């Protein structure tokens, strides 16, 4: 499983929020370009931008001091709200998992 560790360059919630917006905008543009051209290069660009967004999410969770229980509660609440809004998960073998845990990395 691929793992992303927080970066040491963003230290405030504001910095993380701005970087998240920047990367999300770049991901949006890359996805639109891939949707239009549907080429290997545009696919790879979109994938890289999505990974950048996930890096930013990781950084934000770190800066906020989020613990694993709070993260899991937030994800469960989002799932509940999606169901209430008529948005249902697609039965698939593919699952995007974000495990927010404290590990000792040496």
Q: Where do the PLM segments sit?
A:
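Flexible "arm" and connector segments at domain edges
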Residues: 1-106
């Amino acid at each position: 499983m691929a793992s992303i560790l927080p970066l040491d360059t963003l230290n405030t919630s504001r910095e993380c929020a701005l970087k998240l917006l920047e990367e999300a905008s770049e991901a949006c543009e890359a996805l639109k370009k891939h949707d239009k051209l549907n080429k290997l290069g545009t696919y790879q660009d979109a994938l890289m931008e999505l990974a950048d967004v996930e890096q930013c999410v990781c950084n934000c969770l770190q800066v906020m001091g989020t613990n694993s229980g709070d993260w899991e509660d937030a994800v469960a609440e989002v799932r509940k709200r999606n169901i209430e809004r008529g948005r249902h998960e697609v039965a698939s073998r593919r699952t995007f998992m974000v495990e927010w845990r404290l590990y000792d990395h040496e």
